[in-house]
Structure formats: structure tokens, C-alpha cells
Swiss-Prot record:
Residues 5-195 form the Glutamine amidotransferase type-1 domain. It comes from Clostridioides difficile (strain 630). Residues 196-386 form the GMPS ATP-PPase domain. It comes from the Bacteria. It catalyses: XMP + L-glutamine + ATP + H2O = GMP + L-glutamate + AMP + diphosphate + 2 H(+). The gene is guaA. Pathway: Purine metabolism; GMP biosynthesis; GMP from XMP (L-Gln route): step 1/1. This is GMP synthase [glutamine-hydrolyzing]. It holds the Pfam family NAD_synthase. ATP binds at residues 223-229.
């Protein structure tokens, strides 16, 4: 089934993916294209509506991103946001200029709305502004429909041509009733019906996969992460026993993670699963290696070798399943080419695996949509909402050289940490939390005796996408319980510290 489509035209704004997600939350399928996309390509997509994103440039400068005037002649409703309203105004003959110190607006701003179908049902008057330029004169045929004390054109429209623009950001949470404005644009102006749901996606995708793969064979590298897990179950729904999954257990997983993967996919979904216990092999390769990038490279390359060896035992495979999701496609060139994700985001495409074609069942989905699909498919919440885990696993959470002893210590400490977060009801509130084992020992006193044991670092952050993050303000009583349990229950640890570094300047992982 072909769904109604709204296009987001990206001018370099930081919220391009957020806008697309907001559209999809309205049950409308959405894709992102760069502002350099040709008019022919836009026409081929046959969109019901178009949204211009914000951007860091000034519309009146010659080298700034622009758009062909032809797009305004398509008869398709267009909504310009921030830079989007400015480039619309500039291209159509309005005047955009740099704002003076008083005219620059950042953060929550009081606004006065006029009559417009965009603002139907809006009862609040606070929006989120982030601009240094402003529209001094709107193009011919446009009407000003909102203003602030310092921004005379906070919104404009040309109803006859179905062109609309807002200077603020309705897509961000801080903009009161911004979701209503987007809904009004989609349903009142673009006249969409809202036919994009997880149910419809699953049904359409299974049908598509059956037609594409038929009775041929597919191979999937299963990590136990959300993306590869959902991809595997979706493919299995379509082709059943013609799917084989290889799960390379490199010995660098969290406590019980390998057993959980085996239980879920073998017992619950009855998927052909080959579990390869390669712990000794990986630890042998990592012996004495302490530099983070060297560890990453070793783990990535060794995974590829193990995967190739196991897949070659199976003979020819027609399809290789990849868990590529939509942000990967966007970041690789706005849909021109897909980023081929390797297992755990390490390594690359196996060179010696005999397959004809790659299949990416999730390439149209954002992460939150992948999770919804996973729940619809019956994958348990514990896996679907598990915190992000790096490809090299404990190999980069053990700081310095990696040994089995250190991995075992870290596994136990991390398990205690996660257990306490779940008991406190904080696990789902946190984007990512984990324990790390620095290559440091400290002096302590336990049972009236001097100890010299490892220090464990705790990390917890909040984020929407992992690009930036804030350290999580953990309640002191929870921290105290976690620290006491780790020191009392995990042999080889006598000190616990909590990392309060945001990103930037730090990264989320320590290595």
C-alpha cells in the first residue's frame, strides 16, 4: 500500500529529524530530502505537503542554502519553519534582514496570534524562538498572522497559494501547542487522512518481504540490540525457516545478555539461531591492548572473521539482513544511499559471505518507531527498551587492557546498577546508564583490613538522540544503595564514583 507522503526539505537545521518524527506521530508518512533535491525528484514523490526546516544561515547571503522558485508553483501546501519562512520570503520577493540586538529572540517568547487555519484551537501564547534574522517585508500576496514584541512577522500566509510560514519552532517540546499547529497544517491544510501506523507498516512490510525474498534464504547478524532484533523478527514473520541468524557472543556482553538473546529468539520465536561462543578468541586478540581505537578495530575485524567463518558453513545465502534505520539513511546523504550498518556498528560488510542482495526492513523507521514495531511483534519490553550498548561492548567499558577477570567484575557491578535503577523506577527515565571499570585501584578499609581494589565509575545521562546529553541528577539515596551493594556484593571493588560530565565536553562512553 502506498501511503500519503509529506516531505521535509532540510536546510541544515538541527531539528530536521524531530520535525519528521512529529509528522509521523500524526500518522502521516514523512521523508527528509536535502534542499538541493531537484524539482523532478520532489514531483516524483508526489507529496501531500512540504515543510522547510530551520537552518544556521542567512537567507539574504549569496552562498546560503536556497530553493528553486518552481517548488512554490507545484500547488502543494508548504510550511516554512524559522529559516524556512525566511527563505520562502526571500525567494518570493520579501525582505529578510539581520536583526539588531533587541530583535534577536531565543527561548520562550510571548506571541500574539491572528486568525489562521494554522492556529485553529490554539489557546496559549508562548512559542520557542531561535533566530537572529527577521522578515522586514512579506512577499506580495502574503498576510502577517502572528507577531511578538520584537518580531513583526512571527507567522505569515498566502491562503490562495497554500503557503505558510512561522518564525518559531512548533516541533520542539518547549513550544506550547506546537503539536497542534503541525496537526492543523497536516489535516486542515494538506488534507491528509493519516494512514501511517505501526500496524499498517508491519502488514505492508511482511507482504513486501514475501514478494522480494520468496522461498530464497536470508542471513542476519543478530546482536541482541533493538534494531537487529526487530529486523530479524520481521523477516522471520515473512519467510519463516528460510531465515538464519548468527549471534556472535564475543564475551563482552552484559550479564546474562547472551542467554537472553538465545532464549528469546530460539524459544519464543523459534528462529534458526546459531550462537557462536567466541569469548576466548576475542580476549586472546585483545590481550595487552589498551588503546581504545585499537580495541575497537580488533573487535570489529574479529567479528567479521567469525561471522564469515560461520556463514560459509551454511553455504550460499541470497540475502543479508541489515538493521539500518532512517537516521542512518539521512546521515549518509539524505536518502541517496543507505549506510550499511555492521554488527554493533563495528567492522563492515563481510567480504567473504556469499549473498546476492542486502535487505533493510527498517530503513524507513526512526528509533522510537522501531521500538513500537518491536512491541507489536511481541518482543519483550526488557529487550526493546534496553539502554544503548556500544558495539565493542565491555571492551571499551573496561578502561585499558581487557581481561576476563575485569569483564566479570564489570558485568556484576553493572547488573547491580541496573537492578537498582529498575527498582527505583528510574531505568526508563534515563537515556543510557552503565558502569565502567577504569584501570585504577584505590586503597580502602573493609573489615578492619586494608584493601587495594578496583574503582567502579557510574554513568547516567538524559538525551533525545545521543548527539548531546546531560548527566542525570540521580537521587542521593539511590546512589547510596547502588554504591553499598556494588562494594558489598562485587569482589575486587572498594570504591564507586559518579560521572557528572555532560556531552559536550565529554562523550557518553568513556572510551
Amino acid at each position: 500500500m502506498k501511503h500519503e507522503l509529506v516531505l521535509v526539505i532540510d536546510f541544515g537545521g538541527q531539528y530536521n529529524q524531530l520535525i519528521a518524527r512529529r509528522v509521523r506521530e500524526n500518522n502521516v508518512y514523512c521523508e527528509i530530502l536535502p534542499c538541493t533535491a531537484s524539482i523532478e525528484r520532489i514531483k516524483e514523490k508526489n507529496p501531500k505537503g512540504i515543510i522547510f526546516t530551520g537552518g544556521p544561515n542567512s537567507a539574504y547571503l549569496e552562498d546560503s542554502p536556497t530553493i528553486s522558485k518552481e517548488i512554490f508553483e507545484l500547488g502543494v501546501p508548504i510550511l516554512g519553519i524559522c529559516y524556512g519562512i525566511q527563505i520562502m520570503s526571500h525567494v518570493l520577493g520579501g525582505v529578510v534582514r539581520k536583526g539588531n540586538k533587541q530583535e534577536k529572540e531565543y527561548g520562550k517568547t510571548a506571541i500574539t496570534y491572528g486568525k489562521s487555519s494554522l492556529f485553529e484551537g490554539i489557546t496559549t501564547n508562548s512559542v520557542w524562538m531561535s533566530h537572529t534574522d527577521l522578515i522586514e517585508k512579506v512577499p506580495e500576496g502574503f498576510t502577517i498572522v502572528a507577531n511578538t514584541n520584537d518580531c513583526p512577522v512571527a507567522a505569515m500566509e498566502n491562503v490562495e497559494r497554500n503557503l505558510y510560514g512561522v518564525q518559531f519552532h512548533p516541533e520542539v517540546e518547549h513550544c506550547l501547542e506546537g503539536d497542534k499547529i503541525l496537526t492543523n497544517f497536516l489535516y486542515n491544510i494538506c488534507k491528509v487522512k493519516g494512514d501511517w501506523t505501526t500496524d499498517s507498516f508491519i502488514e505492508d512490510k511482511i507482504k513486501e518481504l514475501k514478494e522480494k525474498i520468496g522461498d530464497k534464504k536470508a542471513l542476519c547478524a543478530l546482536s541482541g540490540g533493538v534494531d537487529s532484533s526487530v529486523a530479524a523478527v520481521l523477516i522471520h514473520k515473512a519467510i519463516g525457516d528460510n531465515l538464519t541468524c548468527i549471534f556472535v557472543d564475543h564475551g563482552l556482553l552484559r550479564k546474562n545478555e547472551g542467554n537472553d538473546v538465545e532464549r528469546i529468539f530460539r524459544e519464543k520465536f523459534d528462529i534458526n539461531l546459531i550462537r557462536v561462543n567466541a569469548e576466548d578468541r576475542f580476549l586472546s586478540k585483545l590481550k595487552g591492548v589498551s588503546e581504545p581505537e585499537a580495541k575497537r578495530k580488533i573487535i570489529g575485524e574479529e567479528f567479521i572473521r567469525v561471522f564469515e567463518e560461520e556463514s560459509n558453513k551454511l553455504g550460499k545465502m541470497d540475502f543479508l539482513v541489515q538493521g539500518t534505520i532512517y537516521p542512518d539513511v539521512i546521515e549518509s546523504g539524505h536518502g541517496n544511499a543507505a549506510t550499511i550498518k555492521s554488527h554493533h556498528n563495528v567492522g563492515g560488510i563481510p567480504e567473504d559471505v556469499d549473498f546476492q542482495e542486502i535487505v533493510e526492513p527498517l530503513r524507513e523507521l526512526f528509533k522510537d518507531e522501531v521500538r513500537k514495531i518491536g512491541l507489536e511483534l511481541g518482543i519483550e519490553e526488557g529487550l526493546i527498551f534496553r539502554h544503548p550498548f556500544p558495539g565493542p561492548g565491555l571492551g571499551i567499558r573496561v578502561i585499558g587492557d581487557v581481561t576476563k577477570e575485569k569483564c566479570d567484575i564489570l558485568r556484576e557491578a553493572d547488573a547491580v546498577y541496573m537492578d537498582e535503577l529498575r527498582k527505583a523506577g528510574l531505568y526508563r527515565e534515563i537515556w543510557q546508564a552503565f558502569a565502567t571499570l577504569p584501570d585504577v585501584k584505590t586503597v580502602g578499609v573493609m573489615g578492619d583490613e586494608r584493601t587495594y581494589a578496583y574503582l567502579v565509575g557510574l554513568r547516567a545521562v538524559t538525551s533525545s538522540d545521543g548527539m548531546t546529553s546531560d548527566w542525570y541528577k540521580m537521587p542521593y539515596d539511590v546512589l547510596e544503595r547502588i554504591s553499598n551493594r556494588i562494594i558489598n556484593e562485587v569482589d575486587g571493588v572498594n570504591r564507586v564514583v559518579y560521572d557528572i560530565t555532560s556531552k559536550p565536553p565529554g562523550t557518553i562512553e568513556w572510551e
